[in-house]
Amino acid sequence: MAAREGVDNRRTDTRERALAVALELFATHGYTVTSLREIAEHLGVTKAALYFHFRTKEEILTAILRGYLDGIAALAVDATARQPLTAAMREELVRRFAEHQAHWGIDLILLVRQNYTEIQSLPIGEEVREVMASLVAALAPAGSGPAERLRVRTALSAFQIAAVTAARDNDGDGDALQEAALAIALEILAG
């Protein structure tokens, strides 16, 4: 039994490492130009070993985005279940969103920004739109109009802007920028 568990752990580890390597390569080189062979080489496995876990780049991209979206969807479900949200509840949810963004890091943000067209053309693209829209709807007060939904979207985008600024402009401490993004997001939501 222990030998079987060791094999399963290696498979899981290889899969998780493949997702991490692919995320970095997709973010830095682009989804379109990154090949399965390149992912396998960076991972230190054969293309056949990678193929055991993922048959296509689309499967890899979908797995990466689904992992990210699961956390966002959980926030949206939590926010919806707690309606109507108090200011303190909204603040807590935005703080959790900030933690989720920090967990995924700059590579996820760059992946989405730099490969937006490709992502939107895949089935996961619709899921990205739906999950983000559900979070915006849950964080916007009941009966709010377009202006309040835009306020929520703007608040959530502060974390992406901070991460990109830190990565591209080498503008100070990334943690300080994320803290500033949180403060700005909360100010925006407070109106």
Residues of each region from the PLM?
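N-terminal intrinsically disordered/low-complexity leader segments
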Residues: M1-D13
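Helix-turn-helix
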Residues: R17, V21, L25-E59, A63
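Solvent-exposed, amphipathic alpha-helical segments
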Residues: V21, L25-T28, G71-R82, A158-T165
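Hydrophobic alpha-helical connector segments
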Residues: A63, A74-D107
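Hydrophobic/aromatic residues within well-ordered alpha-helical segments
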Residues: I64, Y68, I72, W104, ...
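Hydrophobic/aromatic-rich alpha-helical bundle segments in the mid-to-C-terminal region
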Residues: I109, S121-L189
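Short linear capping/connector segments at secondary-structure termini
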Residues: L111-E118
